[in-house]
């Protein structure tokens, strides 16, 4: 799925638009953005909300502050997420205080490469989530992450590959 016309023109993607929704094996999927305002670039990212029982994950793609504010205005408290994939890898153009307040994430995942050239996530963004009280996870430091979910109680553990599969040279017993 893609929100930007340029990606759609290449023919390998389907359009995503706010309001699209489906259910699969008791899990609800809902597209929250882009709407019909003609967003481009990062702000045309598909924003996907995934929910099952008391668990909700929000996957906002590369949206920036302008789209975060539009989502807060439109969805308010229904943006609350047990797990939040940090918008735009935690760049300084995203994760505004109001967005953090309304998403109220228990866990935040920063998806970025180790020593990436963009310096994602931005230290100020990490600090905002830390002050909010969210548990933070960095793919650059952890390797892939796996979230264990119980639909009745929400997210359980977030498991790091490097913690569950340490190499013999890591020096951990």
Predicted regions and their residues:
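Non-globular, low-confidence helical/coil segments that flank catalytic cores
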Residues: 1-173
